[in-house]
Amino acid sequence: MEKLARKQVQALTPYLSARRIGGSGDVWLNANESPFDNEYNVNFTRLNRYSECQPPELINAYAAYAKVTAEQVLTSRGADEGIELLIRAFCEPNEDAILYCPPTYGMYSISAETIGVETKTIPLTSEWQLDLPSIERNLDNVKLVFVCSPNNPTGNVINRKDILSLLEMTKDRAIVVMDEAYIDFCMEVSTVDLLATYPNLAILRTLSKAFALAGLRCGFTLANKELIDVLSKVIAPYPVPVPVADIATQALSEAGLARMKYQMLDLSANRAYLHAGLMVLNGVTVHEGWGNYLLVQFSDGDAVFKAAWDHGIILRNSPIKDCVRISVGNREECEKTLGFIRNQLM
């Protein structure tokens, strides 16, 4: 069967999500999930009917939250589908390319490789910022430039002046895609205000992180109407199931937003607790981050990751040497993780 697959697919290494990697334990801090399991009222009386392609109540609710117009919003099955839609809509297979800046989210390259679109990589600088001169030298045939901010796994925010420079250098050449999956934790640095100035800007959002709805698979692409109209040509006819739209709309209601903001305060306190406890340990460097996770460097990160794994504390190893990414869980999970690491390093 393998030989019947397309050559690009035969050569493809699938994205190793936290769930694919697996593990066995009672502390799961490897997927940047929220520890809050919120309840929703779900209407199961309309499941014999197809959902609307873009449910108006959901679109209007997210537009209000994001402070954009409804025509600037497209909802999809997670932000991952938004990545795929952008590549399918704007990149010619075996002709065009995307560009991204590692270390960063791995689905940009996999989504491109799946359909035969070249990937160009320009590593982030030593301070995990954009290497603008190198990006500019490598823009030939590039249709999409993916920038994650706050970046996963490093946690830092990309300098706004560099984003502006990137938008300027790609005018009439390429679309800059800002992946803002973690922006709810630092909305003040969102690039959403730049949509008014730059038609070559697209923004990816999700309900998986701050809204505690990773299992719902609901994401959004924000852009100007002309770009949204192009994406609408390639999206599936019924991308958002009825229960998903119902739950997401509830999460974006006044009560839902109040709960989300309260829970973010709790997560912020837990992140500060974890950060303070780790940074005083010998041989440990905690990198400043803005999301619901911390990138932590040890003298031997692989050893810490494996020891925690064997102890039932599931963290995420990192492509960055000796670094482990730790999601911020509830206080009990953070205490257990910190206590284990402290004992491990003694």
Curated annotation (Swiss-Prot):
Q: Which domain of life is it from?
A: Bacteria
- What reaction does this catalyse? L-histidinol phosphate + 2-oxoglutarate = 3-(imidazol-4-yl)-2-oxopropyl phosphate + L-glutamate
Q: Which cysteines are joined by disulfide bonds?
A: none
The EC class name is transferase
Fetch the Pfam families from UniProt.
Answer: Aminotran_1_2
Q: Per the entry, which co-factors are needed? A: pyridoxal 5'-phosphate
- Residues found modified as N6-(pyridoxal phosphate)lysine: K209
One GO MF annotation is:
pyridoxal phosphate binding
The GO biological-process annotations, alphabetized, read as: L-histidine biosynthetic process
Q: In which pathway does it act?
A: Amino-acid biosynthesis; L-histidine biosynthesis; L-histidine from 5-phospho-alpha-D-ribose 1-diphosphate: step 7/9
Q: Per its UniProt record, what CDD domains does this chain match?
A: AAT_like
Q: Which UniProt keywords apply?
A: Amino-acid biosynthesis, Aminotransferase, Histidine biosynthesis, Pyridoxal phosphate, Transferase
PROSITE patterns noted in UniProt:
AA_TRANSFER_CLASS_2 (PS00599)
Stated EC number for the protein is: 2.6.1.9
Quaternary structure note: Homodimer.
Write down the NCBIfam families for this protein, in alphabetical order. hisC
Q: Output the HAMAP family linked to this UniProt entry.
A: HisC_aminotrans_2
Family under the similarity heading: Belongs to the class-II pyridoxal-phosphate-dependent aminotransferase family. Histidinol-phosphate aminotransferase subfamily.
Report what the protein is called: Histidinol-phosphate aminotransferase
Q: Which organism is it from?
A: Aliivibrio salmonicida (strain LFI1238)
Gene encoding this chain? hisC
